[in-house]
Amino acid sequence: MPEFLKLRRVLVGGQLLVTLLLVAFMVVPVVMSVMAGLTVNYFRGVSSGLTLKWLDQVWTMYQGSVWLSIEIALATLAITLAIGVPAAYALARSRSRWSRITEELLVLPIALPGLATALALLSVYGGWSAFRSSMWFIVAGHVVFTLPFMVRSVAAVCAGTDLRIMEEGAASLGASFSQRFLTIVLPNARPGIVAGALAVLTLSIGEFNLTWMLHTPDTKTLPVGLADAYASMRLEVGSAYTILFLLMTLPLLIAMQWLGVDPAGAQTARAAARRKRALLRQETLEQAALPLSTTPNTAETAR
């Protein structure tokens, strides 16, 4: 066997080994946590027996946090859809430099720590006691944090050349702006809307830093309850809470992978770029074929 093939096998084997070690490093703690939530005694392991009593205890104590997290996530999604989709369309259609500045400002909450965003909200709206003690205060923070994901996902689709051409064609046929937006823009922007919606739901349910600063004893969400369970109760209870958390978030993550969703909209942008390149190639071929098709007519005219 040639020397370079041996070296290649060694390198591939080394990369595979490193990859498996990294996967084990990340997966083993999750598996151990799940097992701790299903065993009678974590320190004795599976030999102590399997049980669902910890899950039952967690559900009895924290089901209010579960439903509150779902309500906050759905409210956040509704607001980000109402604001993000029109904003993404406007940013994609605008050619002003201010639109680019606005887009960068929308992404700013992602770059800032969640604690900084929470402190800003507390300093401005913390004096409104009714608002401060309601779930809508947390919803406001989640909207600020998740809105960029909705805007970028939808804007990547709206910036596509084919969508612009369809809009121009509908406008030339007399369609109003509302008709174009409802019958052309929204149906074609569906992949970006679905991507943004899944990202918003996942991020809202799992957000901890921002929620920790904004919550009150009456507005304890799922991640806050998870931290409380690990800090003040048995390890088995906290691990059972982890199982409950995974049962809520894993379906969303699987849906994102199954649908090929990229929260930042990169995949949608790549698809739009591919369509644009295909359209440009088609136009180039048509222009190249035009002189060939007109040559016989020109020669006949000369005769």
Predicted features by range, described:
Residues P2-Q15, W98, A155-E167, A171, ...:
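C-terminal transmembrane helix and the adjacent membrane-cytosol boundary/short C-terminal tail
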Residues P2-R8, L74-L106, L119, S123-G127, ...:
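Transmembrane-helix boundary motif in ABC transporter permease subunits
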Residues E3-L11, N41-Y42, L55-M61, I205-D262, ...:
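Interhelical loop and adjacent transmembrane-helix boundary motif
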Residues F4-L5, F43-R44, S48, L52, ...:
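Membrane-interfacial helix termini and adjacent extracytoplasmic/periplasmic loops
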Residues Q15-L16, G64-L68, G126-M150, P191-G192, ...:
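Loop-to-helix entry region at the N-terminal start of transmembrane alpha-helices
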Residues L17-V27, V144, V151-V154, F177-G206:
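Transmembrane alpha-helices
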Residues V28-V31, M35, A82-P86, L119, ...:
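Membrane-embedded alpha-helices of multi-pass transport/permease systems
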Residues Q63, W67, E71-I83, A87, ...:
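Hydrophobic alpha-helical transmembrane segments of multipass integral membrane proteins
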